[in-house]
Amino acid sequence: MPRFVELSHQIVPGMKTYPGLPEPTVEVLLDYEASHKRYQNQAEFYIASLHLCGNTGTYVDSPRHRYRDGVDLAGIGLERLANLPIVTIDATGGGLAIDGDAFRDLDLSDRAVLFRSDFSKRWGTAAYFIDNPFLTAAAAELLVSKRTAFVGIDSLNIDDTGDPSRPAHTRLLGAGIPICEHMTNLQALPASGARLHAVPIAWVGGATFPVRAYAIVDQD
């Protein structure tokens, strides 16, 4: 049987994903007790509204996140978000800047390339918001040249937050490659032999949105 691996952080009211962005809140519209009258004590239901920023938890960036005329979430083809063969890149042994040396000789065409830094171990602490691993501009350029379908990282940002030009976002999204940030559990994935599913809602005009990303690992 295949093995499923959770790759997303849970969304909890009050959680902080990125400095300066609002935290998610929940508004209960109908609770179990209040629903008794509506359904004449024959059934009970719970309905709530979740208020969140698109950049909450583990989320996917569409090209619209970087470009005014870029493809929005609803416009990303499912072939770039689901059933993608995964190539996991171990980036735990170097410094903060991840260059192309670890994947220069790999076939990445039509694959999801996930960069494992183990930075996700800091999730939920103040340390998560400083000194994050990131892709260099050259690494992003190499990913584009290799016709990568999807790029993910278990870090605060795929870019160096000290660089306002955001070269990785600029190059990857400019090439139509979705980005997934704040991933987790990448250490549970093999270098190859797994498939990724990371589909956001089909939000027309939306630029970013949380996903429940997961991998299916072939056990054969």
Outline where the language-model segments fall.
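Active-/binding-site microenvironments in catalytic and ligand-binding cores
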Residues: M1-D220
